[in-house]
């Protein structure tokens, strides 16, 4: 029963958004005509119109928000206008597949539902929890607004795609969706993308060990916790036999570089920014321990972290804070410090540096998980089942 699917994304370009790209190619392989509307990237994904491997991608210019919550009103308003404009140009579709944040695409979904389309809500983030975690404003007017937008999105959705069981529970309890209307499509690394390459010892800057952080650097991502933990690794554990690489970019990149200098870590850490895949593989293949420092907050506790999945795909042992979904994802492939306890986080890093056999065992367990129960093959089946349910 394949037809024409329109996927809407606002916060990343495609195919840089790996989850959306996996979903797009899975649908293409199942016979769907797939269109994606997303923002243009700044250094990659810059073409306005492009077809890649049979997926038609329509991009629009977007300036990222600055200046706190009100800055997002301008960003999201612009994104909504461009998305609506491009959707009109694409014409009738059978399924509108909206990825959040923000929880605004239901406005387009409602219009297209009146023309016969089904609406799938792919909930990448719990936006109310994201708001509380990112902005220290409490349950103010804007918080109540994002709650209303989430409820409207749930009401509009024929089917909800959740990234894990915690999100599924929210869709049923807070969103009022029936169990057969919610499908768990876990984010999973593309196994063919993550493979070991020979370690590059020069990345260790002459030290015996290398630590690595991979991912976005936003206010809720915990890079500041990682840096303070590394300062404690040096000061409390007396360890200076390591070098650390922080791979990725984001809103707090400059602030984190400044914090590393304040902590006296300038000679211990490198910040690479976003790098090509071949360089990413060199860093992960060289790393002895990988860091997942996301602090406990309302969002992180129930979210699946892509970096954890990617560390496991590369067979790297992980140090994480003790978060609900982190333990579901990594299992015994990680050691867990009490939430937000930087001293314990540092102790666990030191423990793994001194135990190469445990590092090897944990890495093998992680690889087995992403090749088995957490593989994209299982997610592929759930995605296609969600589409079948949306178009009975």
Task: Give the positions of each predicted feature.
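Carbohydrate-associated surface elements
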Residues: 166, 187-188
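Conserved acidic donor-binding segment of nucleotide-sugar-dependent glycosyltransferases
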Residues: 334-343, 351-357
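Membrane-proximal helix-turn-helix segments that form the acceptor-binding/catalytic region
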Residues: 25, 84-85, 107, 111-115, ...
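N-terminal subdomain of nucleotide-sugar transferases
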Residues: 1-56, 159
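Nucleotide-activated donor-binding/catalytic signature segment of Leloir-type glycosyltransferases, i.e.
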Residues: 247, 254-281
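A short, well-ordered alpha-helix in the C-terminal region of glycosyltransferases
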Residues: 351, 358-373, 382-385
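Conserved donor-binding/catalytic core segment of Leloir-type glycosyltransferases
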Residues: 161, 204-230, 245
